[in-house]
């Protein structure tokens, strides 16, 4: 058995993909795929950070119409994972040279992701997580720019 006690400097879980109708389908974007951005056709301007949910957390930084998803962070019940979220957000902001104009978080005031959002010092936009799921599905399958403007 090979073992070492080296400190993990940058966490990176495995990416999980499957195939649907012979096309690759991303289940969890992480090592090798994050922070590769995805683009939208909508003409959005500005910088925003969405801190994600409490369970199976990832976050995303939007810069105009480019969106940079984080690697999988994990469940925020564990304070070590909360610290990893804070460190990864800081690293992304440095890497992308971003200072968000707002941070989006869950409506639930006791979620650790909400606490992290509030501690960042940016204006906070709270979104009910079921509504966030609807927007995500709308973006994936419908015309998101129309849905998001309402």
Task: Show which residues each predicted segment covers.
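Internal gly/pro-rich beta-alpha loop/helix module
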Residues: 1-42
């Amino acid at each position: 058995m090979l073992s070492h006690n080296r400190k993990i400097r940058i966490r990176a879980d495995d990416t999980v993909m499957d195939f649907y109708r012979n096309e690759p389908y991303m289940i969890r974007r992480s090592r090798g795929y994050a922070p590769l951005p995805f683009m939208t056709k909508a003409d959005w301007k500005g910088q925003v950070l969405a801190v994600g949910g409490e369970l199976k957390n990832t976050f995303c930084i939007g810069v105009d119409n480019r969106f940079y998803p984080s690697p999988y962070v994990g469940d925020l019940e564990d304070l070590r994972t909360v610290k990893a979220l804070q460190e990864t957000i800081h690293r992304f902001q440095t890497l992308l040279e971003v200072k968000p104009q707002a941070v989006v978080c869950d409506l639930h005031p006791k979620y650790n992701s909400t606490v992290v959002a509030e501690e960042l010092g940016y204006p906070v936009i709270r979104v009910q997580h079921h509504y966030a799921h609807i927007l995500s599905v709308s973006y994936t399958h419908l015309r998101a720019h129309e849905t998001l403007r309402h």
